[in-house]
Amino acid sequence: MNTVEPIRDMDLIFDMMDFLKGQNVRDYVLFMFGIYTGLRISDILKLRVRDVKEKDAVYMREKKTGKEKRFAINDELKPVIVDFIRGRRDFEYLFKSPNFPNKPISRQQAYNILNVAARAVGIKDNIGTHTLRKTFGYHMHQQGVSLATLKEIFNHSSEAVTARYIGINQDIQDMSIKGLSYHKAGRGRK
């Protein structure tokens, strides 16, 4: 299995938003929900309208860990959710399948949605459902959130695991190698 990457470039994130919004509002909201909450796709897909309606946070038992978690709903995400669920019934899945009346879309459908959008906007990196979670973590870190806090949000065993997961280890390695200069060390010849 190939490792998937976060979407590091903000322009590409906005391109994904624009593309998905033009294709299908459900898919747009799925993308937004993922990059604004950092939830695993398995947890996003099991959400129902009642889980987010008039709420400031999502309370759930994580599918992978079995632990109870509370995830705040970001202020930029709230109006997107309000518009999306307007007129919908509380018991409906948030991201319901068009083929099955009372089922959510599958993980495979979510993967396909993200990959079609990524290719359409020119993203060359490996993209998958974990890309949403990794993008959330990467940009939270870029905006000053500590690895310690992200470790807790992601329920990781260490900050090193979190750094590797959100892709900042590779960024640091790349910057370090690009910054290497024997001339700047003062002893090299020009």
Q: Where are the model-predicted features located?
A:
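Conserved catalytic core of the tyrosine transesterase superfamily
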Residues: 1-190
